[in-house]
């Protein structure tokens, strides 16, 4: 299947990743471990829509926790991925507790997960996470188009019950 520009996603995303890694990550941001960064990018996509355990991600990639934090920062500053903080009434906990990870481009996340078609998505164990990523990013894009910046959070209790997105607006909440 092709996009409206006639470029198949299976052709577009590898080229996009190569350009991003070569130009932005290596040349502009100074990352030298390109092969490791590519593995990191794929393993980060495996965690889309999940509470992010940076230590686990680092261990799976064979890199230090500090390197993983640095590379997550690079994904954020280059608008590849972002973290959604947890909601707590205690503001300090919002900053210190674990965030969820999302990719701005759900198609890129799906590609990194090896999902190249609707049929593969339907059969994928990651379909729920990919769908959650899509919903969260589309809501964010909608607010940005309206030039609004509400505070967005996720919530999970000790029994692992969760709310994927909380939108805080002037003291009220939309779930």
Place the predicted regions along the sequence by residue.
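Accessory nucleic acid-recognition modules appended to NTPase machines
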Residues: 4-173
